[in-house]
Amino acid sequence: MPATMPEGTVSFEVAAPIDQVWAFLSDMRRVGGCVPGVQSVEVLDPHRARWNLKVKIGPLSQEFVVLTETLEQVPLQHGRFRGESDNMDMMGTIDLAPLGDATKVTYTMAVQAKGPLARIMDNFMRSKLKSQTEEFAANVKKALEG
């Protein structure tokens, strides 16, 4: 991922076998329910989707339509994706490793704002990405562990 993009990474353990975790994270509709701010996910084809997000920025909220594309999938191990909206670009990876009956998940998301407010938005995203990735991790654990 480009070094200039604000980035957040979180590693966490899920009490579920790796094949179950991979199937969940490969399902854009199901994983969409774990991404903070996602209002809806429209799957366009097996590799592309349209995500509607609502993000709070201080007292304001901003809505985004993000088109995502799966760039790489190594089943049960690694996935790489990108997203684009009118005012931001995103890159992300998910890596899985078996831990007996559990699975270690490492999730990285990088976001770069575009347009006239890019510098301000990048600074905001730098501070927000850590909590966003941690919230995603907690939501995935809850969805898979019950």
PLM region descriptions:
Residues 5-11, 48-50, 65, 78, ...:
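Intrinsic-disorder/low-complexity, polar/charged segments enriched in Ser/Thr/Lys/Arg/Asp/Glu/Gln
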